[in-house]
Regions:
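A hydrophobic, helix-centered structural microdomain
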Residues: 1-55, 90, 167-188
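Intrinsically disordered, low-complexity boundary segments flanking structured domains
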Residues: 15-19, 34, 109, 116-122, ...
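Short charge-dense sequence patches
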Residues: 20-26, 36-39, 83-85, 126-136
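Short, glycine-rich, amphipathic interfacial segments at transmembrane boundaries or analogous
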Residues: 31-69, 131-157
Length: 188
C-alpha cells in the first residue's frame, strides 16, 4: 500500500526522469536484470536506465565509475540514487521490500557461504539496507581495483553479507527506520 502511494506521489517525478532518459539516448526507460529474491526465486528488477543500450556482453555484471556506457543523465541518477526509485514497482509487485538485503545477480549468490545462504534468502530483498549506505561509493571503489570483480567477490561482498545477516537476525521496525534515515541522509 505504501509503495502504491509512493508511486502515485512520485509519478510526475518518474515522468521527468523517463523524459530525460528518452531525450538523451534511445532505448527503454527501465533497465531490467535478473536478481535472486526471497527463497532463491529469480525475478527481474526494475531500475531507471542509466547506460546506453548495448547488446548483452556476457561479461561481468558490475559497473565501475567512469564507464563510458553511462549517460550524462545516468551519471546524475546513479550519483543521487534516483535510478533505484523504479524498484518501488518491485515493492508493489511483492518481490521486494523498502528495506532488506539488496538482491544480487545469480552469479554472485553462488558465492554466498552455504551455511548462510538460506538465512540470507529468507527475507524479501530491499531497495536499501545498511550495506547500501556503507557502499554508496561502490562504483568508485571498484574503479580503483586492479580486478573489479575479484575485489567485489573477495572484499565487498563478504562485508555486504555480514550487514545482511545482521539485518536478517534483527528484523525490527526500528532498524528499518534507521536504514531509511541513513539512506535519506546520504542522498540529500
Amino acid at each position: 500500500m505504501a509503495s502504491a502511494a509512493g508511486l502515485l506521489l512520485l509519478a510526475p517525478f518518474f515522468a521527468l526522469i523517463a523524459l530525460a532518459i528518452k531525450l538523451e539516448s534511445p532505448g527503454p526507460v527501465f533497465f531490467r536484470q535478473e536478481r535472486v529474491g526471497r527463497h532463491g526465486r529469480p525475478f527481474r528488477i526494475f531500475k531507471f536506465r542509466t547506460m546506453t543500450v548495448a547488446p548483452p556482453s556476457g561479461g561481468v555484471p558490475l559497473t565501475v565509475a567512469g564507464d563510458a556506457r553511462i549517460t550524462r543523465v545516468g551519471a546524475f541518477l546513479r550519483k543521487s540514487k534516483l535510478d533505484e526509485l523504479a524498484q518501488l514497482i518491485d515493492v508493489l509487485r511483492g518481490t521486494m521490500s523498502l528495506v532488506g538485503p539488496r538482491p544480487e545477480v545469480p552469479r554472485y549468490v553462488a558465492h554466498y557461504p552455504p551455511e548462510w545462504r538460506e538465512r540470507l534468502l529468507s527475507v524479501r530483498p530491499g531497495i536499501t539496507d545498511f550495506a547500501s549506505v556503507r557502499y554508496r561509493d561502490e562504483n568508485d571503489l571498484l574503479a580503483q581495483a586492479h580486478d573489479p570483480e575479484r575485489e567485489y567477490i573477495d572484499v565487498i561482498l563478504p562485508t555486504k553479507l555480514q550487514y545482511a545477516l545482521h539485518y536478517v537476525d534483527r528484523p525490527t521496525f526500528a532498524n528499518d527506520l534507521r536504514v531509511i534515515g541513513l539512506t535519506l541522509s546520504t542522498v540529500f
